[in-house]
Regions:
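Small-residue-rich helix-interface/hinge motifs
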Residues: 36-86
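Cytosolic juxtamembrane regulatory segments of multi-pass membrane proteins
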Residues: 47, 198-199
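Auxiliary, metal-adjacent structural segments of Zn-dependent hydrolase domains
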Residues: 1-29, 34-41
Length: 199
């Protein structure tokens, strides 16, 4: 995970959404680092549990796994699943990302969540994190490094891997842009904003 990707694909959309919302800055600014920490602690687990669950469901042999970084040992971004694999076990985290994006868009557009902390968590974990996850891993593949999309390419072909990577990336990207456009005065209407104002 790179700092620049996290800043551009995760934190920046969150800040923009909050700024366009009906909430005053004092209601959400202190929540941003809390949301980031919760995301950071859950990111590797959600990614690796998808690999592991797919391997177990398909009866693949699992040799070793680590679902979260060992923070107490100073590890900041280590997680892995070593197992027999196929196309589904390799792609499962990104299938999860696509599903999460659809769920996130539905929750936010229907205004099911109206509290800034829960809204921020839903946006970050369900929409912005999938954007980061797919973009980060696909771009690593494009630079010829070994990762999930490289394994998927070896199992299929380079053309198929690029098609899947771009197609999967498009969904959380479009979801993010759509929600940022819909963020104006969220979750309340213009009249509430005019009545109470923003500071």
């Amino acid at each position: 995970m790179t700092t620049l990707e996290i800043a551009l694909l995760l934190m920046l959309p969150l800040v923009i959404f909050f700024q366009r919302s009906s909430w005053k800055m004092k209601e959400y600014v202190f929540l941003i680092p809390i949301i980031y920490v919760i995301w950071y602690l859950s990111y590797a687990f959600l990614h690796e549990i998808c690999h592991l669950s797919a391997a177990l469901m398909l009866g693949k042999k699992v040799y070793d796994f680590q679902l979260i970084p060992y923070f107490w040992k100073g590890e900041l971004g280590v997680g892995y699943v070593k197992s027999e694999y196929n196309q589904l076990t390799v792609l499962m985290p990104y299938i999860k990302d696509v599903v999460f994006s659809v769920i996130g868009v539905s929750l936010i557009t229907k205004k099911v969540i109206k509290k800034p902390l829960l809204t921020g968590l839903a946006l970050t974990i369900l929409v912005f994190s999938p954007l980061f996850d797919i973009a980060n891993n696909y771009l690593v593949y494009v630079t010829q490094a070994i990762n999930d999309f490289r394994a998927f390419s070896d199992l299929t072909s380079s053309a198929v891997a690029h098609f899947v990577g771009i197609s999967f990336l498009a969904i959380p990207l479009i979801s993010t842009l759509f929600l940022l456009m819909k963020a104006k005065n969220y979750p309340f209407g213009i009249y509430i904003k005019e009545k109470y104002g923003k500071q």
